[in-house]
Structures are given as structure tokens and as C-alpha cells.
A protein has these predicted regions:
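Hydrophobic mid-domain F-helix/FG-region of cytochrome P450s
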Residues: 62-68, 83-91
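Short, surface-exposed recognition loops or helix-turn segments adjacent to catalytic cores
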Residues: 74-85, 102, 187-193
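Acidic, His- and aromatic-enriched active-site or binding-groove loops in soluble protein domains
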Residues: 94-115
Length: 356
């Protein structure tokens, strides 16, 4: 919604094909549980201005590139289309007036199962036979390849004009994606519904094994900007949930050691109370050099400060005693090896960075 308002307001000043990414906190009325939060960070990528299937392929490629860079290899980008969904509902005998309500129910298939979805479809006014036929049409094709799913959908959608057009659009997206990193991860999935009614075309969702829910999702929303501008503006986007990604990476041990271990690169010791300003200034300069630095805040014995540094997982410790101060230098100890060297303070940041 915020992006749609911005595009509507500045449409005349934006390029014809406008792309953007954004990482920001969002809030939703959700029940907190593993991987689900009321406040969370969302990573968005959107492309405005074209109805071409090139856009979907590029959006999926961007998401795939990010996940691969983070170390994911077993993710699946589930792909479907709103017109395919409506065509399947038509073929099952669900009247058009109930399509939106039916899609909200079908979007819960992963969470409540077939029996739960069927019961909700009936509650929403879909007949028993039509509900059963819809569930059969929306059966997940997790064990089938894209060609087999395509064949099944083509058979079900025969004679459904918009549904056939939607399937053809999915074929174009798959074809365009073969030259991207997303190509080997995209799977046609008739069970993917995404209940948000503003989607108008292709929809997608990222799944990984052993995670209830998804790492993110998105789709084409060609009418959303028009709600604010009064003009039709094609758009497509994808959102990744940062916290969910972090949960999975943590459980799988995917973080590199320098990230998984929270210790500082350097612990700056405090020689005595009179040297507090000197230690703070040294820490400031080392942080400016791009180092993670912690200052020991009390003038305890150096042995105690070294013990603390070791417990914190610090890589190096700096000690500026009276002799070092007179030379404009610092004694640097590498905790893993015990090696010590005296380094000019002016060179210290670069010297440490070269050894991290």
C-alpha cells in the first residue's frame, strides 16, 4: 500500500519502468508463534510499469539470488496465477460470486488441511460436490515436475478462456526464468492461492523444508496503484520476511562463525581511571576503521580484563600502559595464539583489519 500511494503521487516524475527495493518494519494482527510476529522486518522488491512476464522472471531471480547468497540451496519458489485459480473454481462448479471467499479458504490448505478447507468452503456457501471438486483441482503437485503439472492444469482448464491465458502466462515466466538462478527452483503449484484479493496475475511463495509457512511471497497487482491514481498501472513485487529467514538460518547453523559468535573484534582495556578518555578515543578510532570494539569500563587488573575478553570471544586486546603511551603505541595481544606486538596507534586500525 505505501508503495502504491507513492507511485500514484509521483507517477509523472518516475521513469516509465520503475524498480525499487526497501527493508522496513511492518505490523500485522497475527498470533505470535515460531517465525510469526506482530512486528517484523520485510524486505521488498517491486517493479512498476510493465505487464511483461519478463518482470516476474526478474523479480523471482532477485529473490533467488538473495537466498542463494545467504546459503539456501533447497528452497522452492511456488508459482501459480489468479486466473488459473478462478478457472479451476469454474471447472469445479463454484459460482463466480463465491470465488474470492473460496480463495481465502483454499489459501489455508497448508495450515488446516483438506478437511478444514472443505468445511470452510461449505460454510462460505460452496456446495459439497463443488467443494470436493475444487479440492481435487487444487491438489498440491509436490511430487510432479512442471511439465506434468502443466498437463494436468491444461486438461482441467480446457475451455476456460481466462484460465488458459493464465496458464500461458505461467509458461512464459518459466521460460524466461530458465536463464536465471530461479529457474531450477520454480515449481508450478495449483494449491498456491495467497488470499489477498489485490493480486491480479502470477503469484509466488518461497518455501523451505521443515518450515510451517513461507519465507516470503508476492505476485502481480496491476490494479492497486489505480486505487489511488485512477489510472491502471501494472506492478509486480515480492516480499521476504527477515525474521523467518533468520530463524531458519539459526536452526540450520548457516551463520558464518564471525556472525554466529557475538564477541568483539577488539577489547580495549582500561589501564587506570585517568586513562578512561584515552581508551574511549582509541575505541572510537578503531570503530571508524570498521572494527567491532568493546571498551572494558573499569580499571580492574589487566589479568581480569584479559579473562573477560576471552570469555566474550574477543579476537584481540589492546593495552596502553605508561610505556606504550609514551611511544604513541598500543600493546596488542591476539588471544587465540597469545602473540603480542607493539603497534603505533596511528597504524592500529589498518593493522587489525588486515588480520581479521
Amino acid at each position: 500500500m505505501p508503495l502504491a500511494r507513492v507511485v500514484a503521487e509521483y507517477q509523472g516524475k518516475l521513469p516509465k519502468f520503475f524498480k525499487r527495493y526497501q527493508i522496513q518494519p511492518v505490523w500485522r494482527a497475527d498470533r505470535p508463534q515460531k517465525g510469526r510476529f506482530r512486528e517484523f522486518y520485510q524486505c521488498d522488491v517491486d517493479a512498476i510499469g510493465s505487464t511483461s512476464a519478463v518482470v516476474e522472471a526478474e523479480v523471482c531471480a532477485a529473490v533467488s539470488d538473495v537466498l542463494i547468497r545467504l546459503g539456501f540451496t533447497d528452497f522452492t519458489i511456488r508459482l501459480n496465477h489468479r486466473d488459473v485459480l478462478r478457472g479451476l473454481l469454474d471447472s469445479a462448479g463454484v459460482v463466480a460470486a463465491l470465488h474470492d471467499a473460496a480463495l481465502v479458504a483454499i489459501d489455508k490448505l497448508d495450515r488446516v488441511g483438506a478437511d478444514g478447507v472443505k468445511a470452510e468452503l461449505v460454510r462460505r456457501g460452496v456446495g459439497e460436490d463443488a467443494a470436493a471438486a475444487a479440492l481435487a483441482a487444487f491438489a498440491s503437485d509436490t511430487s510432479a515436475d512442471n511439465a506434468a503439472v502443466d498437463g494436468r492444469l491444461a486438461s482441467l482448464l480446457a475451455g476456460q478462456g481466462s484460465g488458459v491465458a493464465g496458464l500461458q502466462n505461467l509458461r512464459q515466466i518459466l521460460s524466461n526464468s530458465t536463464v536465471t538462478s530461479a529457474g531450477r527452483h520454480i515449481r508450478l503449484d495449483a494449491s498456491l492461492a495467497r488470499g489477498l484479493s489485490y493480486y491480479t496475475g502470477a503469484i509466488f511463495e518461497v518455501a523451505v523444508p521443515d518450515l510451517a509457512g513461507s519465507l516470503g511471497g508476492g505476485g502481480r497487482y496491476d490494479n492497486l496503484v489505480g486505487m489511488f491514481s485512477g489510472q491502471s498501472v501494472p506492478a509486480c513485487g515480492f516480499s521476504l520476511g527477515l525474521e523467518r529467514i533468520l530463524v531458519v538460518m539459526g536452526e540450520r547453523g548457516m551463520f558464518p562463525p564471525e556472525v554466529a559468535v557475538s564477541g568483539p573484534d577488539v577489547l580495549v582495556t582500561l589501564w587506570n581511571d585517568q586513562a578512561a578518555g584515552e581508551s574511549i578515543a582509541l575505541a572510537r578510532d578503531l570503530r571508524s576503521a570498521g572494527l567491532r570494539v568493546e571498551v572494558y569500563p573499569e580499571a580492574d587488573k589487566i589479568g581480569k580484563q584479559l579473562k573477560y575478553a576471552s570469555a566474550r570471544g574477543a579476537r584481540f586486546v589492546t593495552i596502553v600502559g605508561d610505556d606504550e603511551r609514551a611511544k604513541g603505541a598500543a600493546n596488542v595481544k591476539q588471544l587465540a595464539t597469545g602473540d603480542q606486538q607493539t603497534i603505533p596507534v596511528s597504524d592500529l586500525g589498518a593493522w587489525l583489519r588486515a588480520r581479521l
